[in-house]
A protein has these predicted regions:
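Membrane-embedded alpha-helical segments of integral membrane proteins
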Residues: 8-52
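Juxtamembrane/interfacial segments around transmembrane helices
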Residues: 65-67, 91-94, 110-126
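Glycine-rich catalytic cores of cysteine/serine-nucleophile enzymes that process amide/ester linkages
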Residues: 105, 116-203
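Internal/C-terminal transmembrane anchor helices
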Residues: 59-82
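Membrane-helix interface "capping/anchor" motifs
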Residues: 3-6, 53-64
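Juxtamembrane extramembrane loops of integral membrane proteins
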Residues: 103-104, 110
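Alpha-helical hydrophobic membrane-insertion segments
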Residues: 3, 7-10, 40, 68, ...
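Alpha-helical transmembrane signal-anchor/signal-peptide segments
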Residues: 82-101
Length: 203
């Protein structure tokens, strides 16, 4: 086998492994019930592919089967809807909204918690009207975690007179729910637009 053909086969093999891995995880973290069925179908992905590689010829039929299965799982994954009806953690329980009237915007449910610690706080919200003609600055703020290589960034809009309004896109977690980066790749969390007093998000 020439070097070029060997390289192509290696790339195809790596691509298939990546696709199979994604499919297995997408099924495992899907909302499919019961849980044992989800786990079984997830395990069936690599096992079925291995059996097909051993028994099915020509190999292009195996590749076609993997592609077909991938498209089915991808379509199901894309169809998973977000939900607004869950028992949310208090930090992300109240949705903000706004009314726009000409050059004025009234923002409701601006978060302004009184924090005693990261987990001990008193929820508080207010509504405020901003004159968009007085918007004079936009700050990009980075909050670093896991060292200097990873940061959460958000925007703070500054208005003449000293008013600031921060907007941060965050994970909307349920009560008792932790965070997993891996699960985050598979639609396990809704997203939430935190609209807050700048002092709420910069502490």
């Amino acid at each position: 086998i020439g070097f070029g053909r060997l390289t192509v086969r290696a790339l195809v093999g790596l691509g298939c492994a990546a696709v199979l891995g994604w499919m297995a995880l997408a099924i495992y973290y899907s909302p499919l019930q019961p849980a044992w069925l989800r786990a079984g179908l997830s395990a069936l992905v690599p096992v079925g592919a291995a059996v097909a590689l051993l028994l099915v010829r020509p190999l292009r039929w195996v590749l076609a089967g993997i592609l077909g299965a991938f498209l089915v799982v991808l379509a199901a994954w894309l169809a998973i809807p977000p939900s607004n009806q869950r028992d949310w953690q208090p930090e992300v329980a109240v949705l903000p909204y706004a009314d726009l009237h000409g050059d004025s915007i009234t923002v409701h449910n601006v978060r302004n918690f009184a924090y005693r610690s990261e987990t001990d706080f008193t929820p508080a919200y207010y509504a405020k009207t901003f004159d968009l003609r007085k918007l004079d600055r936009v700050d990009l703020i980075a909050v670093y975690w896991m060292g200097p290589a990873v940061a959460h960034v958000f925007l703070s809009f500054g208005f003449a007179g000293g008013d600031h309004l921060a907007v941060s896109i965050e994970t909307r977690k349920e009560k008792g729910e932790g965070y997993s980066t891996l699960k985050g790749f598979f639609k396990q969390y809704e997203l939430f637009y935190v609209v807050a007093d700048e002092r709420d998000v910069i502490r």
